[in-house]
């Protein structure tokens, strides 16, 4: 059994401004936080939700009838649900004690491309978890934070020399968003990973369930992979 606290920090993007070509805002991809939260709490973790600024917004594209299963929709529409209550009372990362956590899980949404690379409070928590031998995990666009999480022993990113996945360039093209990402000067997940010295892997289909486990580093490719990524993160924690 791990000597680390069985407490997880579930990171949420604080950016919820304009992004989509039609003018829609982006933000948190709802199920990429809901599904990991469900897995982590079922595994006995205490889970705190935090963003860099203590604010959040939900990407409207993530809560459409096509994006949510019937079970997800029931949760989303139940404002008294424990997850929704915690989301409504989201914490500011810099107000938290990094040493309280043994697992760091970064949820996603395109908002993460804006704020995660410079989210000093969230990065500090992840660096503490990593330095103490804990698990760092991220899904979909959340690996945008990984190049900026430093290994205190090497001074390099924790993904340097490791294998990761994350949302694919192919997926951005399928969603007709790659041009917008480039226009805004944002860094696609693939590019950020490779620049940080990681080996990037991807599934055959952009929305196939796909995860990569490299020791204490656990990543997933897309929204359908959020549940499986959290399951793998719990398994990695239990092996510590």
Model-assigned labels for residue ranges:
Residues 1-132, 145-240:
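Extended, subdomain-level signal for the structured scaffold at the beginning of enzyme domains
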Residues 138-143:
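Short, thiol/selenol-centered motifs that function as redox-active sites or metal-ligating centers
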């Amino acid at each position: 059994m791990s000597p680390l606290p069985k407490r997880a920090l579930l990171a949420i993007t604080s950016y919820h401004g304009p992004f989509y070509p039609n003018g829609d805002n982006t933000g948190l991809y709802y199920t990429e936080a809901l599904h990991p939260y469900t897995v982590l709490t079922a595994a006995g973790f205490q889970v705190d939700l935090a963003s860099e600024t203590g604010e959040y917004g939900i990407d409207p594209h993530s809560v459409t009838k096509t994006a949510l299963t019937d079970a997800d929709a029931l949760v989303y529409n139940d404002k008294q649900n424990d997850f929704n209550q915690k989301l409504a009372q989201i914490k500011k990362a810099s107000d938290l004690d990094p040493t309280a956590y043994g697992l760091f899980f970064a949820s996603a949404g395109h908002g993460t491309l804006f704020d995660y690379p410079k989210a000093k409070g969230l990065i500090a928590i992840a660096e503490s978890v990593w330095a103490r031998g804990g698990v760092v995990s991220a899904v979909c666009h959340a690996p945008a934070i990984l190049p900026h999480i430093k290994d205190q022993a090497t001074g390099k990113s924790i993904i340097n020399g490791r294998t990761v996945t994350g949302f694919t360039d192919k997926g951005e093209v399928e969603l007709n968003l790659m041009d917008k990402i480039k226009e805004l000067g944002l860094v696609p997940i693939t590019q950020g990973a490779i620049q940080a010295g990681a080996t990037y892997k991807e599934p055959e289909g952009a929305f196939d369930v796909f995860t990569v486990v490299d020791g204490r580093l656990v990543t997933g490719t897309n929204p359908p992979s959020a549940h499986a990524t959290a399951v793998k993160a719990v398994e990695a924690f239990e092996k510590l």
